[in-house]
């Protein structure tokens, strides 16, 4: 049975440095996925994640459990990566190139966009990935956090600092843009709803 974040954090606050390593190991995979999507470069993401965990360690005594630890952590990852992208003069965009996104791509398309299409071919997967990457950054970030990271709307609000209504609108618009773009690329006519 694994320890809860609260138990691990309590041990860290009591001076057990090894427990911080346990906390990092527990969350680094998902944090890295988010960092790679934002920065689109594994090396930059690793550097940003190192900065993130230093910030987390320093701020841990002030963490108040108003949200889950993972939500708080993702907020720090998000802010650190957006800042890093800005310093490099790059536009903030999220990517679907990270390993393990195959199932997420299937879900994006089969559940929400074009329910009659089976996501079997690599060509179709490429189209989906390309169109998600073409989303305007404002829509792409909210959409990716919701669909790929499987965050709740409330968690996205906490991570990004964007109001709930705005998050909902951005996800809705992202889905609409994807539906149109994928249908156009696949030469399907959009059915009137």
Indicate where each model-derived feature is located.
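N-terminal module of bacterial RNA polymerase sigma factors
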Residues: 1-30, 37, 116, 154-155, ...
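Internal acidic/polar
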Residues: 2, 91-118
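Sigma70-family region 2
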Residues: 13-14, 40, 53-68, 87-88
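Short, charged helix-capping/linker segments at alpha-helix termini
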Residues: 13-22, 32-51, 164, 187-188
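Amphipathic, Lys/Arg- and hydrophobic-enriched alpha-helical face
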Residues: 24-42, 59, 132, 181-184
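Structural recognition of an alpha-helix C-terminal capping motif at a helix-to-coil junction
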Residues: 33, 47-54, 67-79
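Arg/Lys-rich amphipathic alpha helix in sigma70-family domain 2
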Residues: 61-65, 75-96, 182-184
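DNA-recognition helix of helix-turn-helix
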Residues: 82, 128, 139, 145-148, ...
């Amino acid at each position: 049975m694994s320890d809860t974040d609260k138990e691990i954090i309590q041990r860290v606050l009591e001076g057990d440095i090894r427990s911080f390593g346990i906390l990092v190991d527990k969350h680094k995979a998902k944090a890295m996925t988010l960092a790679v999507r934002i920065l689109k470069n594994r090396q930059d993401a690793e550097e940003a994640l190192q900065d993130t965990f230093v910030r987390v360690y320093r701020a841990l005594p002030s963490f108040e459990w108003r949200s889950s630890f993972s939500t708080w952590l993702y907020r720090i990852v998000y802010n650190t990566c957006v800042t890093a992208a800005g310093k490099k003069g790059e536009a903030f965009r999220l990517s679907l190139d990270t390993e393990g996104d195959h199932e997420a791509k299937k879900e994006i398309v089969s559940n929400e966009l074009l329910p009659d299409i089976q996501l079997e071919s690599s060509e179709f997967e490429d189209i989906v990935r390309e169109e998600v990457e073409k989303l305007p950054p404002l829509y792409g970030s909210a959409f990716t956090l919701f669909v790929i990271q499987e965050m709740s709307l409330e968690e996205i609000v906490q991570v990004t600092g964007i109001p709930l209504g705005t998050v909902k609108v951005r996800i809705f618009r992202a889905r609409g843009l994807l539906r149109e773009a994928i249908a156009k690329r696949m030469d399907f006519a959009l059915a009137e709803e």
